[in-house]
Amino acid sequence: MRKLLAATLPALALLAACTPPAATGDAAKPLRTGQVPQQAADAYYVRAAEAVDARIAQRGVKPAKNVILFIGDGMGISTITAARIYAGQKRGLDGESYRLTMETLPYTALSKTYSNDFQVADSASTATAMVTGVKTNSRTLGITSGANFDNCASVEGHRTDSLFDLAERAGLATGVVTTARLTHATPGATYSETPDRDWEAYVGTEENGAEACEDIAAQFIDWPEGDGFEVAFGGGRAAFLKKGTMDPEYDSRESYRRDDRDLVAEWLAKSDQHKYITDQAGFDAENFASDDKVLGLFEYSHMEYDMDRAVDPAGEPSLADLTRAAITRLSQDPDGFVLMVEGGRIDHAHHAGNAARALDEADAFDQAIAAALEMTSADDTLIIVTADHSHTMTISGYPKRGNPILGLASSSLDGTPDKALDGKPYTTLGYMNGPGACRSVDGKLDCTRLDLTNVDTTDKDFVQQSLYPMWSEAHGGEDVAVFASGPGSELVSGVIEENEIFQVMGRASGLVAAPAATE
């Protein structure tokens, strides 16, 4: 036995010397040299960077060639649960046990969505957190909390570098896809810096150093980083057309701009490779496997809800189709890419108290995630799926298994609707606040609860009832889910700050330097 040990121990020692250590902090060599963004001294940035760096020290991080950030605007956890049941029932399957594609990703976390100044945040501050690593003031985009809302003079010295800025400087391809306006809060955070998210087509003030500000659409065209976006898809043509120009699809609708800049013409003038498309036919005709740089503005304002696309006059692609096209184009770059995909209209349907469209939009968003997973590899592409904030929709009552998620709550075997203390049935889905609390009767506001006995609550236009009346339902402030796969996804776990998502993407892709490099 001693002879055997004597012969074996040197071999084991040699094997150990040749085996990579399993110690904490063992990470593969990054693909790129990390950059130090100009907001690196911001307190929110520092705390997030240190938190993610500590996880890297424990777990290591694999390098990601590509990064895709999926944001379901307003897709809180109750929305995910209801969308799961809806998607299953829509396909004739058991809704409760159905799995959305996003739910199959191996790593999960909860994200804290508060902004610098609000417990319940808006989409501008939350998008800024995810793409720049700082929490900022609500209704501001791409600037730190040191700048003031609606005040252009306060912006200087409080600018940021987004992950997309850093990607362009490193020579990567970049893209942004949304079903909202391209200049709306979430997509706008990728390229713009403004003290007011509403300045999409013009600066809405003449005070506080207004001359120092540029509207969001103009910032998209004038974006100084690298060679600009390879693909940018969404709605919002009205912000890009010269003052007085009528929309090509709706001849009674005019441009939002107040100046003579024709931003579409400026885009096309950049190079022969710059293309512009506005409808399904143009989308179908484009070769996304080329080196074209494509701006697609498919609607005057926001794109159609997915369940309404069929009646759109000019036709427009689904979010899944836009995602496939974006990945096809971005994959032409051998150096890798960074892409944001937003399901922007989940949020809009919730604000309207319209759960049917909100859940259908979440299902369409999930199909876009499935498309991305089919086209990419978990070996080199980090995919993160999350929401920017939640909404006040709840799932309540005691509906039995298989009860239509959009229907009246029923716990009985024969399907008889359950009734509240007022003797009226109620839906499984409802809102804390919103337009569904009241209705107009003979020109007056009637806020007594409507008897839903003979109402088709599964109709796509049905507005859920709410507890107290508001013209627009409000955001929710609870934590939202984060799902992740691919290199760097191992850093997504526990309860994290929303701005840590930037650090996860930046460190995994090698675009962002470790905290020690910022000192």
Indicate residue ranges for each PLM-predicted region.
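Bacterial N-terminal signal peptides that target proteins for export
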Residues: 1-8
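Alpha-helix C-terminal capping segments
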Residues: 131-133, 165-171, 375
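A post-motif C-terminal structural segment
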Residues: 34-49, 60-65, 75-81, 85-128, ...
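Bacterial signal peptide processing site
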Residues: 19-21
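C-terminal motif of bacterial Sec signal peptides marking the signal peptidase cleavage site
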Residues: 15-17
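His/Cys-centered metal/cofactor-coordination and adjacent catalytic loops
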Residues: 142-157
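Structural beta-sheet core signal
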Residues: 69-70, 176, 385
